[in-house]
Amino acid sequence: MQEQYRPDLIEADVQKYWAEKKTFKAVKDPSKEKYYCLSMFPYPSGRLHMGHVRNYTIGDVISRYQRMNGKNVLQPMGWDAFGLPAEGAAIKNKTAPAKWTYENIEYMKNQLKVLGFGFDWDREITTCKPEYYKWEQWFFTELYKKGLVYKKTSTVNWCPNDETVLANEQVHEGCCWRCDTPVEQKEIPQWFIKITDYAEQLLSDLDQLPEWPDMVKTMQRNWIGRSEGVEITFNVAHSDQTLTVYTTRPDTFYGVSYLAVAAAHPLAESAAKNNPELAAFIHEAKNTKVAEAELATMEKKGMATGLYAVHPMTGKQLPIWVANFVLMHYGTGAVMAVPAHDQRDYEFAQKYQLPLFPVIKPADNSAWDFSKQAYTEHGITINSAEFDGLDFEATFNGIADKLEKIGVGKRQVNYRLRDWGVSRQRYWGAPIPMLTLENGDVVVAPLQDLPIVLPEDVVMDGVKSPIKADPEWAKTTYNGQAALKETDTFDTFMESSWYYARYTSPQYQQAMLDADEANYWLPVDQYIGGIEHATMHLLYFRFFHKLLRDAGFVTSDEPSKKLLCQGMVLADAFYYTSPTNERIWVSPTKVTLERDEKGRIIKAVDDEGHELVHSGMTKMSKSKNNGIDPQEMVEKYGADTVRLFMMFASPAEMTLEWQESGVEGANRFLRRLWNLVFEYNQNPAQTALDPTALSVEQKALRRDVHKTIAKVSDDIGRRQTFNTAIAAIMELMNKLTKASLSNEQDRAVMAEALNAVVRMLYPITPHICFQLWQDLGNESTIDFAPWVIADAEAMVEDEKLVVIQVNGKVRAKVTVPADMSEDEIKQVALAEENVQKFLNGLTVVKTIYVQGKLFSFVAK
């Protein structure tokens, strides 16, 4: 055994061994319990960042731990390879997106290998390869045949100068990123998948996910947004038109004072025909892109249409307004406004002097000042004809019944969830497999024509997608007739919605999935990824699993049993202000720091002498130049050190603050472990451990070893508090470094302890443990060694320390045999001088005994 710990020598050798032996190759084995551990696959942006390293280290620790516990483990890896950044990089670097992507994959794959992750590389998936997206295209055609896919017009960002559609990321302050032309909102036909058909299942099946974080489930519940209400139809005065609204508050129906419609509502557009001012307002509102999240805070604007709706119960004429806070794609594109009981309606009414009719009062009869704000709680109904005096539920049902009876309303369950628009007017994505015939009919591309391959050898001009710019690409035939291929491509969330399932049979060519393999491995046992994916990817992932189930590929309802959302990685960020008043962010690796006695930064200077402002710990990002290159850290300290720091510095689901001092600490710990094994190896145990021949000290040390094993097993296996598991091992190591090695049983206890420590650390720091396991004289490799089991007998204590109290105050501490009875302990306590002193002259009225811990006298 080498005296010095040299990760640079060990790690490459161990990784080479794993690659040659295919140590982590997963093969279906019905006789073994499977464990499928999956971390969200990366977008091949060029380099791994610390967020990736954290995600994949957590997954690797869980995978290796489960393998040691006898499970048949699948841990695959691949590349979410389509997406907009490749187009931008291709234009900037004058290359094709495919070439840029494949080069990045090669580089990043090597980075993953250097970190020692135990992936089954034989199952690698690259989503931009035709053999992958062929089956996605086929599945889309099957969904179309089932009626789950349709085409409708939808709004996109449109650059009139380049005549192209822009992604949200390409719109900068309302203008095109390339030419600065003001961006318009344009309606174009797009493909949608009916996720709303599955809304109820997606909602109710959240109850089947007890091991998903509550926060993610709450976010999905809110995103799906189930509500119960009434759809009400108003007649438009002096016309045969009607206006339909949906409300969850029919109890406020008598308080409606106006109706508001979206700018794109047909009623608004017909009213604008002879009203140029209204037409201009509608044009402006349509071209202001508003995210739903911004609706609450933006300025409410509106204009009267001159039309009126008739209240079906009171006959009142209610003005119809166009309002910028009503969205056409949400509900019916029209709302009934009750300013007295809805704050948004209230603000709009105040601005445009519209009336307010209170119809609810607080249940406790307290007065409400409507001049200040709306009363939005449930309460007692007033000013509502025969419904006066009723509570919310009775009024809701009474008014809903009456609306249904007079034929203008129907009870309805609505969802906030919208259908999934999967069309993208981009090049670097999977082509949508639909054909348009010369007569205008739209048909699915037949299986024998799939995959519709995206050409990879293209030149990007930054304006038009190469497949849209080349009219020849779209030309094809269908049953002998001329046809045109769809030139839109899929939203890249399509690829990431089913990759987890394809990993179970990545080379299978007869179908999308091999059902036998899929049903052996699925559902995923442990999924790991960021909480930022809660309402997009994680919802589509669940939706796709239900589609695969209904297509007969899988039998389970949900794609993954357990979800862990790891926290972000933060680092110090520093900047100075340039002469042009621009913030120049400086990498922390180029900063010299001065700290006060509490470790706080008081001065920061970069290599060029600029005095820097420390803006605190923020998420590692390119924009703040505070990312730390994992590669550099591995070269400096070794992969095991980086992995150990990542798992120790913070609980997995909390943010992790990158501190190089912490990395150095992790490295020192591994050196101590190496040195301890080296020292032991100078004179190793020659005889086996004999538990009956141990001294008190040896028993105590062995007890600590087995208690640590029990804690670490629980922390990693059940609680997933990896940092506390490592802390327990470090605490044990402190005891081991002080332990005697003077006799044979000392060395036998140490041999057992070191073998246990190496096995416990193996999932976290596998390279050093691989080597130390051999150095400790084990014949087999540690990769297939079983997890260490705590010996219950070793943990039994011979003696207990019992605290003695008199009237709640500690007066003595006594060490007694562990099996001593309560009565015997009482006698020992009474024999203590200090106890006698405080009981002197008092009568004991009660004693309290807490098994093996506390004996208390209550005396008067």
Swiss-Prot record:
Entry keyword set: Aminoacyl-tRNA synthetase, ATP-binding, Cytoplasm, Ligase, Nucleotide-binding, Protein biosynthesis
UniProt EC number: 6.1.1.4
Top EC group: ligase
Residues given in the record as ATP binding sites: 622
Stored InterPro entries: aa-tRNA-synth_I_CS (IPR001412), aa-tRNA-synth_Ia (IPR002300), Leu-tRNA-ligase (IPR002302), Leu_tRNA-synth_edit (IPR025709), M/V/L/I-tRNA-synth_anticd-bd (IPR013155), Methionyl/Leucyl_tRNA_Synth (IPR015413), Rossmann-like_a/b/a_fold (IPR014729), tRNAsynth_Ia_anticodon-bd (IPR009080)
One Gene Ontology MF term: ATP binding
GO cellular component: cytosol
Subcellular localization, as worded in the UniProt entry: Cytoplasm
Gene3D superfamilies named in the record: 2.20.28.290, 3.10.20.590, HUPs, Isoleucyl-tRNA Synthetase, Domain 1
Origin superkingdom: Bacteria
Reactions accelerated catalytically: tRNA(Leu) + L-leucine + ATP = L-leucyl-tRNA(Leu) + AMP + diphosphate
Short motif 'KMSKS' region, span: 619-623
The UniProt record lists the keyword ATP-binding: yes
Residue span of motif 'HIGH' region: 42-52
GO biological process: leucyl-tRNA aminoacylation
Family: Belongs to the class-I aminoacyl-tRNA synthetase family.
HAMAP family associated with the record: Leu_tRNA_synth_B (MF_00049_B)
The name this protein goes by in its record: Leucine--tRNA ligase
Species this chain originates from: Histophilus somni (strain 129Pt)
